[in-house]
Amino acid sequence: MASFTSNASKHQAELTVNRMFADILHTQPLRSAKSTTSNKSKSASKFGNDRKALSMPTPLSSTQILSQQLQPQLQQTRLSLKTGKSSQNNNKVKKLLKKKHEQDKKFQKFIKYSMIKNKMSTDPESLTLEEHKYLKKLAKRNINALQKYSKIDDFEIEQEMSSVKNELLKDLAPKKQTRLRKKLAIPAKKGSARSNANNQINDFDYERKLQKGLISAPGLTPGLAPVDYDDDEEEEEEED
């Protein structure tokens, strides 16, 4: 065998021979097998080192520990603030939409009522059955609203109002009677037609009662002539 000048040339020759035999036998060269096994071992060792590095926990500082403890609370407060603001905004939007809907509804009713009112003033016979029903319903609703506002819900106030009403009626009733009595009790003026008629009636009653003997004249005894009565005067009157 030929001598090799160096180990490198010897190794190169061995590789060449191995490749030739590998081509003939269709096998992998020894160098490649050794290299693959070495590569596998290196990769396995590297993977193991990486796993060890990952599995070993790194020590945390006090600031990191405190931040980890406070992190859930901070997230919860942020979430609550967001939800609170969003709920407030939603409520405001809902109120605005509801108000706008009510205003639109009132405006539509006003337009409808104005059209029907105009039709009633110009041509009432042109009103349809639905419009007549609408007017009846509107009138009934307004009457109920007035009755509701005029009614007193408080029982004490209603009772007090009824008592005041009764007192006023009692005060008014005697005044009317006293006025009539005063009118009847006031004597008529002298010289008036009423006074003359009253005097004639009184004189007639007096004479009638005197003739029947129900009353007596002043200075007379029942059944006797007056004290100053003179028979001669009566005879003279008869002779005349």
UniProtKB/Swiss-Prot annotation:
Domain of life of the native organism: Eukaryota
Biased composition (Low complexity): 32-46, 58-67
Coiled-coil residue spans: none
UniProt keyword annotation of Membrane present: no
Chain residue ranges for the region called Disordered: 28-67, 215-240
A single Gene Ontology CC term: nucleolus
Subcellular location: Nucleus, Nucleolus
Keyword Nucleus among record annotations: yes
Keywords carried by this UniProt record: Nucleus, Transcription, Transcription regulation
Family (UniProt): Belongs to the RRT14 family.
Protein name: Regulator of rDNA transcription 14
